[in-house]
C-alpha cells in the first residue's frame, strides 16, 4: 500500500504526490487522516511526475500540504444486498441513521462497466402507477427510464414520493432512492413518509445533500445505482429513484474548472454528455432482472433547452413535464398533458382503446389552448356551439387530471387515491363522449375515479 503526500489543495480538488513507481490509477480511492476524520479522495487525473489530481468526498477544510495519504488500491466500495434496505447511507456507504453497522455480506465498487449488448433486454410491459395523468398520457414501461422535468417548486419530489409509495405497496418491489444535492429537510420528510407508509424495509436510501462538497454529490448517484445493480443481478425487478439528476451534472460543473478543463456552453463541463452517458448506460435492464428508473430533473429557469435537461432527454423512454402554469391553476399533480411523452404510447403496446383515449384527450386540450386567445378577447359567447362543447369538456378533463395524493394528505386534507388504469381510461372516454356533460366542472376536481365525480356532483 503506497503512501503519498498532499502538495496542493484548491477547494474540493486535492493534488497528491506519490513515488513514481506506485502512482494510483484513475478512480482509485485514497485515504487521508484529517484531524479526527478520515477523508476519502478519488483520483481523477494523473498529472505526471508522480502527482495525481483527486476530488475530496468530504469537506477539505483543515487539509494542509505534507499530510500523508494512503492508496487503498481499489475504487470506492459500498455495501450491497438486503442489509442496505431500510437504512440511510452516505456516498461511501457508511450509515448515517445511527442504527449501527450495515452488516453487509458484500461490497461492490461504485465504478462498473455497463452491461454488454448481448445481456440487455427490452420489455413492453406497462408499470401501473395509479396516477391518472401518468398512466393515461405517458405510461411507464417496466425496466424503462422516466424523467420528471420541472422548475423549482412545482412538485417533482412529491410526485416521486407518491410513485415510491404506490409502487412499493401495490407492486411490493425493492427500491433504491439516491438523494443527489437536494434539501436535507426533504430527505428527512422522505424517510418519515416511508416509515409511516410501512414501506421503509423495502427501500435503501443514499443521501448526499446540498451542503455536501461537489465530489460527494458527483458520486452519490453511482453509490445508489450500484446498490440497485446488485438487486437486479439477483434477478429482481428494482426501482431506482434519483432526485435530482441536475445536481449530479452541476457537481460535475463545479469540479470541472478546478480539474483544469475548459468550460463549454453555459459554463457546463466539456464532458457533460459523456458523464451523463456513463451513469445512464448502467441504468438498464438485463435478461436477469430489471431496473426501472425515475429521475427528477430540475429545469434551470424553466428553460428546457438548457444543455443539462436537453442532454438528459436523449436517454429517457418517458418524460413527465411539470408545468408552473398548471400548478398556478391549483391542479396537482401539475403534469402538462400536451408536453409529456412516452415511447409506450403506441397502439401495439397499450392497446387501441388506451391510445385513442389519450390522443383524444390531447386533441381536446390542444383545441382549448387555441381557443383561449379568442375567449380572452371576445368572451365565451362568440364561440360556435361545437367549440363551447369542446371548452366545457376540456375544462372537465383538465380538472379530472388532478388527483389527491397519499403523501400529500397533510396538505390537501383529502385522502389519497390510487386509480386503476381501466378506470382511468373509462373516465376520460366517458367525458370525451359526452356522458358527463350534465355534471358541473367542480365535481371533477381532486377526485379518484369517475364514479367519485358523479357522487361529488350530487353533493354540490
Swiss-Prot record:
Pfam families: ATP-synt_ab (PF00006), ATP-synt_ab_N (PF02874), ATP-synt_VA_C (PF22919). It is a peripheral membrane protein. It is found in: Cell inner membrane. The keyword Ion transport applies. Keywords: ATP synthesis, ATP-binding, Cell inner membrane, Cell membrane, CF(1), Hydrogen ion transport, Ion transport, Membrane, Nucleotide-binding, Translocase, Transport. It comes from the Bacteria. One of its GO terms (cellular component) is proton-transporting ATP synthase complex. Produces ATP from ADP in the presence of a proton gradient across the membrane. The catalytic sites are hosted primarily by the beta subunits. HAMAP family: ATP_synth_beta_bact. Belongs to the ATPase alpha/beta chains family. This is ATP synthase subunit beta. It comes from Klebsiella pneumoniae subsp. pneumoniae (strain ATCC 700721 / MGH 78578). The gene is atpD.
